[in-house]
Amino acid sequence: WIIPGLWDCHTHFTQWSYTLGRLDLIEARSAHEAMDMLRGHVSQLRSEGRLDPNRYVVGMRFRHSLWADDEQPTLAAIDAVAGDQPVALSSADMHCGWVNSAAARKLGVQVGESGLVGELEWFDAYCRLDDAPGAAEELDRLLREAEHDAAGKGVVGIRDYEMAENINTWTGRFANGINGLRVQAGVYPERLHQAID
């Protein structure tokens, strides 16, 4: 061997997985660029026959805090690009979301002119994306890709801080053959009683 196996001691492995299959907006330097990227993504999904009005188009990792004041998210901009197709975009730090009107209705969130959903409401809304049609199958496929991606980087173990029942989640994943990493499952205080039981 060349070096010991690496550990990622603070990851959100589900989110890592999603970056491999969802629209990545990390390179967008403005709301305009993010919407250009979204427009291209929606167009590609449509041309491949994968655009379903009952499923969310999800994007990740926009950084609006780095954008100029006149290049901030707006509900009008995302509605103009997405129309009736539900679209939910998560910020890079996961502390807010940018949704269009169709997604806001489906998720049951209120948005103003910015189209942004604040931190606590976004945490709950983002979790509801996992209940959408086809989401479980997508996640299973992406988890396997992420496990392979981690191995390719020399990562043999992770400490997972997803906001979920991580012990039960990982027990189920291991049972389903997603077992190529050593996992230390983080537990948030509000879920401690579930971990103890």
Model-based region annotation:
Residues 1-197:
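Divalent metal-binding segments
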